[in-house]
């Protein structure tokens, strides 16, 4: 029977070919890709950007819940939040503090840091531009970091260690893409803090340690008090994540956590804690990130929704960390 159907299929295909009709395949071969295979079409962000003015908070909540189940694995109670992840999303929808916008904007954050703890802790700025066409790449140093100010994560920042080896056209295209209005971090999962950020491209001095390694110390502050620090190390190979409590003892809130109680405390740890708590004081929750070089520390960024509120924590830790957040009064 299969042979008969196969024969009929061949005959029909030949007849269609005679009359110039092409039978489309369900799965066509992947076409050859150009050498610049980087075009990114963020469908959901574009849809949210086009339609956000029509959305109600209930519809935004529905959208977050769909992403949450897909990425975290349980259905979140955003109306009566208990876990860390749930409370992050509650604040995204209900706590619209303008100071958060100042702090998530990687350009305006520099003034907030300078005013509150000192300009010596700000990563030095090389330049700021409103569009990629304004950047004179020839004038930039051999090493630098360049980023768009209204997003977080590696998609919005680029590290250049040797300018002679970069593809400037590729970098320009990436930066131009990240400046598009739908790339605003708000349209990913409705984190309000980003919504009113004015997009800019900034270049900063390249920060490094003498040994080439640069650890990232992410300090989690609840009500302005440090509870724990996430250390990201070995970023040039396979990144390791260590969670340290206030006594610098390891704990494992997720399956990715590495337990190593021999990992050294940064030599300027106490100063980091003091600065983190001062910068985070106005907020119910905030994470303050630091870099430590040979003899200096810098504030890298401040974030209010780690991993966009889709963290893969063990439930006991999701609940415990959630209990440390006292929800504020709503601010529309």
Residue ranges, per PLM feature:
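Membrane-proximal basic amphipathic "stem/tether" segments
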Residues: 1-94
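A short, surface-exposed helix-loop junction/capping segment
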Residues: 83-98, 252-260
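A long amphipathic alpha-helix within ATP-dependent nucleotide-binding catalytic cores
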Residues: 194-200, 243-297
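A short, polar/proline- and glycine-enriched secondary-structure boundary/capping micro-motif
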Residues: 157-159, 238-244, 309-313
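C-terminal active-site "lid" helix and adjoining low-complexity regulatory extension at the edge
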Residues: 292-332
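Short, surface-exposed beta-strand-loop junctions and turns on beta-sheet-rich folds
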Residues: 152, 235-237, 305-307
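Active-site nucleotide/adenylate-binding loops and adjacent lid/helix of ATP-dependent enzymes
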Residues: 94-96, 100-213, 223
